[in-house]
């Protein structure tokens, strides 16, 4: 979830805001007052506010595990009154929200399905700006990194308790860190002297562990390790795996789900799921789809879309975003309505 450029009193304009609205516009506008949008990564509420302004008849369900973000978003979206409901949960709590939470908007979603959904993955600019959260590596801060600060393990817990093998695996898998084993060895050696508590000590360790030639060409040496720790702390990949079938099940015919990924491992998961879901199950060689084997979804984006050069120039945080969208074209019985 990456933001860029200033937006009045609310911090940042969301990445690719206009394109996100355009991707869900047709079905949302067609459903009118029956349209329910899900912003599953509500953050500061920038995308949600734009959607509610752009589609004045639509309702919106906003999800966020971060209680501070949810508080601020509720205040920002208060002028929309009963057109908005915010729920504190991880985004893979979507199914439980639709099944268990009471409210007129939830009832509407149960009856008509979801018209459009947005998943803006990763950490938000708001969270990066809150130094005490420990997401940023350029300022010394507690090694926390929890998106929900009320529960779960911290980055310090991982560094101080995980085995060499587990630390190396996390850094390699979630951060594409070439020197994962060397860094893991250095962590175990350092924690014998004193437990890790703040980010500056970890950054210093990474400067020492990563060769100078790599530091000169590979960006900030802490970037990949901090990313990997954040993904592990917040169980981000499992949440993504869990929510993909939840949202596609919840879409109505014509409904679209849009995913904005900032890391390769996220985009690969989304790409594979979309490919599987849009591929016919009819055995190869047959001229037509057998009953019950035709795909119920189609991919809306051709490959992954990216931010424009102008947007990237205004804020480099938009540079890595990859956008993929999928649309339900038939219901579970194969009907087109």
UniProtKB/Swiss-Prot annotation:
Pfam families membership: Methyltransf_5 (PF01795)
Residues that bind S-adenosyl-L-methionine: 45-47, 64, 91, 120, 127
InterPro entries for the chain: RsmH, SAM-dep_MeTrfase_MraW_recog, SAM-dependent_MTases_sf
GO cellular component, one term: cytoplasm
Domain of life: Bacteria
GO biological process: rRNA base methylation
Gene Ontology molecular function, alphabetical: rRNA (cytosine-N4-)-methyltransferase activity
Record keyword Magnesium present: no
Catalytic activity entry: cytidine(1402) in 16S rRNA + S-adenosyl-L-methionine = N(4)-methylcytidine(1402) in 16S rRNA + S-adenosyl-L-homocysteine + H(+)
Protein EC: 2.1.1.199
Subcellular location, record wording: Cytoplasm
Keywords assigned: Cytoplasm, Methyltransferase, rRNA processing, S-adenosyl-L-methionine, Transferase
The family this protein is said to belong to: Belongs to the methyltransferase superfamily. RsmH family.
HAMAP family: 16SrRNA_methyltr_H
Main function: Specifically methylates the N4 position of cytidine in position 1402 (C1402) of 16S rRNA.
UniProt name for this protein: Ribosomal RNA small subunit methyltransferase H
Organism: Corynebacterium glutamicum (strain R)
């Amino acid at each position: 979830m990456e933001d860029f450029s200033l937006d009045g009193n609310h911090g940042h304009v969301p990445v690719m805001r206009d394109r996100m609205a355009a991707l869900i516009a047709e079905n949302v506008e067609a459903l009118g007052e029956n349209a329910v949008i899900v912003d599953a990564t509500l953050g500061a509420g920038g995308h949600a506010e734009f959607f509610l302004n752009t589609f004045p008849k639509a309702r919106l369900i906003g999800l966020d595990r971060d209680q501070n973000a949810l508080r601020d978003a509720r205040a920002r979206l208060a002028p929309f009154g009963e057109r908005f409901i915010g729920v504190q949960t991880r985004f893979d709590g979507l199914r439980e929200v639709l099944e268990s939470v009471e409210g007129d908007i939830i009832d509407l979603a149960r009856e008509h399905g979801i018209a459009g959904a947005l998943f803006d993955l990763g950490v938000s600019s708001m969270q990066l700006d809150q130094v005490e959260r420990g997401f940023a590596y350029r300022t010394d801060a507690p090694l926390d990194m929890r998106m929900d600060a009320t529960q779960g393990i911290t980055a310090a817990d991982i560094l101080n308790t995980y085995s060499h093998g587990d630390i190396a695996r996390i850094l390699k898998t979630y951060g594409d860190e070439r020197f994962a084993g060397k860094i893991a060895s250095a962590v175990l050696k350092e924690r014998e002297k004193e437990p890790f508590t703040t980010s500056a000590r970890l950054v210093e360790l990474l400067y020492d562990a990563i060769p100078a030639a790599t530091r000169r060409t590979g960006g900030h040496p802490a970037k990949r390790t901090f990313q990997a720790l954040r993904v592990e702390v917040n169980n981000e990949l499992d949440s993504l795996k869990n929510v993909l079938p939840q949202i596609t099940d919840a879409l109505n015919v014509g409904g679209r789900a849009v995913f904005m990924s900032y890391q390769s491992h996220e985009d690969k998961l989304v790409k594979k799921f979309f490919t599987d879901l849009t591929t016919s199950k009819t055995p190869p060689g047959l001229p037509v789809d057998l009953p019950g084997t035709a795909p119920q979804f189609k991919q809306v984006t051709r490959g992954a879309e990216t931010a424009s050069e102008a947007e990237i120039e205004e804020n480099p945080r938009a540079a890595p975003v990859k956008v993929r969208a999928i649309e339900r074209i038939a219901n579970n019985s194969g009907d087109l309505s």
